[in-house]
């Protein structure tokens, strides 16, 4: 669990960095990053990062794939420009826009391998802004680079988790062999012994196993 949390926090930092860089490069006031969550059935699109918005706005915000401007961009896989979000029927966050003084918006899709939609990048301005073709091309380029960066980061995290899992299994297996020899137990009995020690001491099985290996080296 701790490794999963750590990996999530690492990805969260990458998401935050993306929106900060996009906002700085493009000169927009607010940038938000939404990513497709395919673990849901049907899939949803979730807000992963934004800047200059109250933290409570970000917590567990998700939309259906065909809902709002985010869903529109995700479904059509095409950029969307809105001159005034308060006048846009499909824009769902009018209360938030009024509160923050947001006016114009441009949304572009994040396309992954083989053109598969992986998310949406939304950019807002606090004054009326006519997003030009140059603006959209820049946002599209940045969005595609972000999609690659996110995918590469996910692969790195997955690799690290697999490596840690293999290391954990190997350590527990070695500890189990030591307990089998010391106490003349079967493999299953030794595993249950380690698990009970873990529960009784409120330590993880890897911590108990590492302690067993250390004691074996000392004696």
Question: Language model features by range: what are they?
Answer:
Residues 52-53, 119-130:
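Short beta-strand-to-loop transition segments that serve as allosteric relay/switch motifs
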Residues 19-23, 30-61:
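GAF sensory/regulatory domain recognition
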Residues 103-112:
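A short, aliphatic-rich beta-strand micro-motif
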Residues 140-147:
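Allosteric cytosolic regulatory segments
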Residues 44-46, 55-92, 98, 106:
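Regulatory sensory and allosteric helical modules in signal-transduction proteins
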Residues 1-5, 10-33, 69, 193:
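Amphipathic alpha-helical coiled-coil segments that mediate homodimerization
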Residues 7, 11, 15, 66, ...:
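The cytosolic transmitter module of two-component sensor histidine kinases
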């Amino acid at each position: 669990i701790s490794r999963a949390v750590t990996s999530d926090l690492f990805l969260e930092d990458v998401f935050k960095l993306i929106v900060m860089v996009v906002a700085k490069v493009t000169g927009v006031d607010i940038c938000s990053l939404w990513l497709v969550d395919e673990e849901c059935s049907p899939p949803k699109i979730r807000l992963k990062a934004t800047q200059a918005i109250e933290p409570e706005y970000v917590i567990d915000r998700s939309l259906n794939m065909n809902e709002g401007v985010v869903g529109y961009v995700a479904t059509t896989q095409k950029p969307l420009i809105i001159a005034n979000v308060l006048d846009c029927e499909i824009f769902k966050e009018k209360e938030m826009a009024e509160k923050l003084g947001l006016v114009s918006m441009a949304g572009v899709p994040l396309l992954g391998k083989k053109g598969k939609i992986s998310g949406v990048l939304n950019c807002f301005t606090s004054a009326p802004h006519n997003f030009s073709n140059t603006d959209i091309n820049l946002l599209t380029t940045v969005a595609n680079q972000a999609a690659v960066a996110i995918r590469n980061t996910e692969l790195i995290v997955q690799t690290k988790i697999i490596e840690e899992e293999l290391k954990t299994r190997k350590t527990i297996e070695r500890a189990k062999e030591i307990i089998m020899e010391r106490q003349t137990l079967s493999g299953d009995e030794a595993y249950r012994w380690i698990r009970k020690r873990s529960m009784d001491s409120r330590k993880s099985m890897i911590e108990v196993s590492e302690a067993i290996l250390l004691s074996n080296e000392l004696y």
